[in-house]
Amino acid sequence: MKNPHKKIYLGKYIFTVLLLLAAAGVWYWYAVAGKSDEALIGKAIAALASDLSKNKQESTATALLKVKGIAGAFADPMTLGMDQYAFGSYDRERLLASIGRYRAMVSRAEVTASDITVEMLDKEHAKVYFSGRFAGELKNGMSDTIVKDIEAESVKIDGKWLIKSMKFRSVLH
């Protein structure tokens, strides 16, 4: 006659092994998978979009942190290709001046980056493709929503991924 308790005892082992495998999978995801170069570049682009956003009640301290975050996302020098408004090579000083003008003209802005695709060229270089959306209001009361396809080149400098160039293309919407 078979012992029914042996079946339950074996079931506890199987359950414990499955639980340990699930815990190992979760640990792997948080420890390794979220730190891949592709994930780090995607997070950097999302952080840049967040820093470019602005609300009407934003404090000076928050604004300074965002300006620092924006400037820190780019290599020095970097190249920008956005219509006739912002085109050419930017060193750190020129980039900070442009960020200051942007923030002074805008009273409210919601900037998002979506459909981020990273193509690793080698361990230190990557191309990033995404859609950028600006929905905002200028201080003169004009408002607009702009959607662009963006191609960026990223370079890894001192272990951090920085944007070396950005090219904007118009999108029909």
Language-model regions, residue ranges each:
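N-terminal Sec-pathway targeting helices
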Residues: 2-20
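Hydrophobic pocket/interface hotspot
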Residues: 70-71, 78, 95, 128, ...
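Short beta-strand edge/turn micro-motifs at domain boundaries
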Residues: 13-14, 29-34, 125-129, 141-173
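Hydrophobic alpha-helical membrane-insertion segments, chiefly the h-region
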Residues: 20-30
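Short, solvent-exposed secondary-structure junction/capping segments
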Residues: 49, 68-86
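Surface-exposed, charged secondary-structure patches
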Residues: 94-140
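Ser/Thr/Pro/Gly-rich low-complexity linker/stalk segments immediately outside membranes or between
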Residues: 30-47
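N-terminal alpha-helical signal peptides/signal-anchor transmembrane segments
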Residues: 45-56
